[in-house]
Amino acid sequence: MATLLQEENTTSLEAIPSNTTAKTRPTVLVFDSGVGGLSVYQEVRQLLPDLHYIYAFDNVAFPYGEKSEEFIVERVLEIVSAVQQRHPLAIVIIACNTASTVSLPALRERFTFPVVGVVPAIKPAARLTANGVVGLLATRGTVQRTYTHELIARFATDCKIELLGSSELVELAEAKLHGEAVPLPTLKKILHPWLSMREPPDTVVLGCTHFPLLAEELMQVLPEGTRLIDSGAAIARRTAWLISTQENLVSTQEDNLAYCMALNEDTDALLPVLQGYGFKSLKKLPV
């Protein structure tokens, strides 16, 4: 069975002891095209349980994996701006690999608050691999983008990197959160290029925030001893540091809430799931 690791962290994180009062409860926006960013939110909230969290997802333009870079940048700017007009944001986490690889410069130019992105954990994977074969499991867009290949060239020149892009895995993760079972034969078909290799990757980077939601099923399908690595814990530590270095943060006593771009039957079904993650309500964000 495969093993799930987190970037530069192989033990569970303990929550930072809380001395948070109403005066120090700043707002954190976690954004993704879908629900995959909940995997990042879980890690951040585990470390920083007493902040005010907003989760926003773009269920109108989902998925981002095969959208143009220009569209993604403009869309993310529009959504973050709409949230910022309604809430005093202390920090924004772009919990989407695709959006992170193209929109971070524009976001940091537009806004004064810190913006944290998610990038594939190529560097720790290259350090951990024993057989020198690292798999990057991501969307097709992330696999093809120049940024990803620059990461590989910078941190993994001594490794053989096997790239596997799949939008179907994103759909499977979304379906799982809606209560549907993940068919293992489908996973095996998607992963066939690796499973049929004489020496498959012994370390797999989960290069999409949806994919940690499928970790249990992936570990059943991948070869014994395969390590799975995601960036959630590293993002949580980065967020904690950035919050600790800011002064005069605006606090709120509002409940955690989620925003979508359109309300429909799917979002009605998703509301109990979001409530299970600590979000009291789900609202449409006018954009």
Swiss-Prot record:
Cysteine pairings via disulfide bonds: none
A molecular-function term among this protein's GO annotations: glutamate racemase activity
Active site residues according to the UniProt entry: C96 (proton donor/acceptor), C208 (proton donor/acceptor)
Binding site for substrate: D32, S33, Y64, G65, N97, T98, T209, H210
Top-level taxon: Bacteria
Family matches, as Pfam families: Asp_Glu_race
Metabolic or biological pathway, per its Swiss-Prot or TrEMBL entry: Cell wall biogenesis; peptidoglycan biosynthesis
Reactions catalysed according to its record: L-glutamate = D-glutamate
PANTHER family cross-referenced by the UniProt entry: GLUTAMATE RACEMASE
NCBIfam families reported for this sequence: glut_race, PRK00865.1-1
Record-stated family: Belongs to the aspartate/glutamate racemases family.
Protein name per Swiss-Prot or TrEMBL: Glutamate racemase
Organism annotation: Serratia proteamaculans (strain 568)
